[in-house]
Amino acid sequence: MNKKLLQSVREYKKQSIIAPLLVTLEVLMEVLIPLEMAKIIDIGIAEGNLGYIIQRGLILVIMAMMSLFFGVQAGNFAAIAGAGYAKNLRHDIYYKVQDFSFKNIDHFSTSGLVTRMTTDITNIQMAYMMSIRLLARAPIMIILSWVMTLTLSRKAALLFLIVIPVLGGTLLFIAKKAHPHFIKVFDEYDELNNSVQENVNAARVVKAFVREDYEIGKFHGVSKYVYQLFTTAEKIVAWNSPVMQFVMYAVIMILIYIGGKGIVTGTMETGALTSIIVYALQIIGSLMMVTFVFVMIMIAGASTDRIVEVLNEIPEMRDPADAVTSVADGDIIFDHVSFSYAGEGGNLSLKDVNLHIKSGQTVGIIGGTGSAKSTLVQLIPRLYDVTEGSVKVSGIDVRKYNLEALRDQVSMVLQKNILFSGTIYDNIRWGNENATDEEVQNVCKLAQADGFVREFPDGYNTQIVQGGNNVSGGQKQRLCIARALLKKPKILILDDSTSAVDTKTDALIRKAFREEIPNTTKIIIAQRVSSIEDADLIIVLENGEISGIGTSEELLKTNAIYREVYVSQVKGDEDHE
């Protein structure tokens, strides 16, 4: 087991130690039982001594009961240790992921992280639980059984001494052959989960375009590939059982031959032969047990590599040693900023952007699809780090801020609006968990959400289903805006967050912004010119570069892109009227 993963055992160390100790006592009782059986056969039955048989029989029953007791207790402690270890490991990974930047998450993919925290950890849990019990049991059983066999027959002990390493080496060879295939299997599980996640999230789109058959075919393709990979791995592992069975029967036949010859010549008792055969079965059974655990360890080994990869991942963004812990105002400067999602050497999404947004200004951003509008604003709360240049908030490079302090003063309403399971109160309080009901209602009024919320039978106590699928797109956007406002940020960013809202409501939201939060810097990305027409400053982006900056009137005179969008939308509105 990887040392890094073992750090997650923590408070379950005691159970992890007690379980093998109980297993040792269980094995000790099991090893002594055949010796008592031999005495009953060779002395009690041979001499017809009923009293001796009863006496030794009672001892044998007591040993069996003690073995059962120790075994049950060992199983209980192993189960507690395994489940507790898995719980800690899930927590450790989950806490680690919370520190990941978008770039870190992109590296693993959402479905990949979900697979690691579910399937992979379950595999490790099973392997750990079996290891602290069965891997402790097998070596002790093999050693003690061999020692007991040595006291009964040197030839039989020598036979075991030859068989054990040969068989162990064979099993190890099989394990090494199968391991790479299991790694491929779990990598492909990510694709399988991704397919399911994508289909479930886009269920409405799939049905709207009648693409069920296509999605079924896509899922079947990934599922079939997982099946083929797993089958290949299992075909290799399947050699374990036949090899073990062959060795077991071969050893028993040789023992019967050696023992039978000894009984005929008078050098071995019948009870001793019986005990040796039982010890042989115990040894081979222990090796079969090891084989079974090896299969689990092989599967867990692939999972371990994937878990360690997450735990070893260095968060892209970390607080500096002397981090700035307060944001004075909403002044923003982009100083020769270039950015690539692939890092240095990658294709630039933003190219040499220079921009100054004064605190309290309302700034509109417009541009075609792929012009890097969202990319630009995501650099402000440091969701990504610039590739070149710097982004400054209140005159300080964002990389010098404490991340929590910076993001606490920058509220973003992303393109994809997310609501969580819970009441409307619960969702809005993501902006400030200590907010009063009155504060929640006030920000909803600003976001023009209070009206429709009060129309619900349960008002602000209305339950939102996962993803917010029981409210409309426009309602969802307004609730997300209210949530962002509750933080009382220095900077508010709306990334195309009023696209599902009618123009009248959109205008009311902007009016509320001007009147109620004049000192907050407001950055609005929009496709509708009407949403940003009255902004203090409008930025036109094209292919990751600033094509124009100015007011709406200035850009109509100087920027062809803005003029074209403006004219087409105004003309479209007139034609519609």
Locate predicted features.
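An intracellular "coupling" helix at the cytosolic face of ABC transporter transmembrane type-1 domains
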Residues: R10-K14, F77, D99-K103, T119-I132, ...
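Helix-loop-helix
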Residues: G48-Q55, L144, M148-I162, T232-R306, ...
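Juxtamembrane helix-loop junctions of ABC transporter transmembrane domains
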Residues: L21-L22, M29-D42, L50, I54, ...
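Alpha-helical membrane-protein architecture signal
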Residues: N2, K14-I18, R90, D106, ...
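Membrane-integrated ABC transporters
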Residues: M1-E30, M37, I45-L60, A74-A78, ...
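ABC-type nucleotide-binding domain
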Residues: S326-E577
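Short intracellular "coupling" helices and adjacent cytoplasmic loop segments at the cytosolic face
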Residues: E47-G48, A83, H91-T115, T119-I121, ...
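Transmembrane helices of ABC transporter permease
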Residues: E11, Q15-L28, K39, L60-M63, ...
